[in-house]
Regions:
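RNase H-like, Mg2+-dependent phosphodiesterase core
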Residues: 1-257
Length: 257
């Protein structure tokens, strides 16, 4: 069984997004290299979303970078190319009730575990953005990994696009909070809406701005979903054609402790 040898690097240099870490892993004999990242840790509303991506080394995707540096249209374009050309990808989300029950660190970790657990065939090497995972898979944690590794960048793009789509849907349910624009983060307009309307059941009540908003107790009615159910969208593809046709959003994956 491979030894878990996660290494966290914090150097400020060398943050140009490239395939350097993927090449080094292949030189050591690892073939299915999986990038992992999450989006939404700082949001006051909705789920945290994680993605895992195994890129195809023979199908280069130009322009991969930290999702925060990309425009909305560029992220959408790259997300489609990732889904079409990656060897495998999976996206998992942890809802606000579990974030409140567990804390955001544990929720983010569980989302990552659920995503990587749905990569088929399984990855043999992990590149993770700033976190170690309790798995017996060789792994490397990189500070600012989404700006340094193309695999982590690809995961950050898929996670960001998926979460943005969710926020667009939630904006239809709760238009007064401006979720399509602020994505649930603590912008002045969102904080003002919290003061005026109070939070929704999908806000994170463990976060101070939500907890301290007026009338929050009246709205805190959401019951945590069963902890054994995590929403996962996954495409365990073996070819670009398969990747484009076998996405199965809404399947569930077990919680991995």
């Amino acid at each position: 069984m491979p030894v878990n040898s996660a290494v966290v690097e914090s150097r400020a240099m060398g943050r140009l997004c490239s395939s350097r870490y993927e090449r080094l892993a292949r030189q050591q004999g690892w073939m299915r290299i999986c990038g992992i990242d999450e989006v939404g840790r700082g949001s006051l509303f909705g789920p945290v979303v994680a993605a895992a991506v195994v890129l195809n080394p023979r199908r280069r995707i130009v322009g991969l970078d930290d999702s925060k540096k990309l425009t909305h249209d560029r992220r959408e374009e790259l997300a489609q190319r990732i889904r079409e050309h990656a060897l495998a990808w999976a996206v998992a989300e942890i809802d606000a009730s579990r974030i409140d029950a567990w804390n955001i660190y544990q929720a983010s970790r569980q989302a990552m575990l659920a995503a990587v657990g749905n990569i088929r065939p399984a990855a043999d090497y992990l590149l993770i953005d700033a976190m170690e995972l309790p798995l017996s898979i060789e792994q490397k944690a990189l500070i600012h990994g989404d700006a340094r590794s193309i695999s982590i960048a690809a995961a950050s793009i898929l996670a960001k696009v998926e979460r943005d789509h969710l926020m667009d849907d939630f904006d239809q349910l709760y238009p007064q909070y401006g979720l399509a624009q602020n994505r649930g983060y603590s912008t002045p307009d969102h904080l003002e809406a919290l003061k005026r309307y109070g939070p929704t059941p999908l806000h994170r009540f463990s976060y101070a701005p939500v907890r301290e908003s007026t009338c929050w107790a009246v709205n805190a009615t959401q019951e945590p979903l069963p902890l054994a159910e995590i929403s996962v969208a996954t495409t365990p593809a073996t070819s670009a054609a398969t990747a484009a046709s076998t996405s199965t959003p809404g399947t569930t994956a077990p919680v991995l402790d």
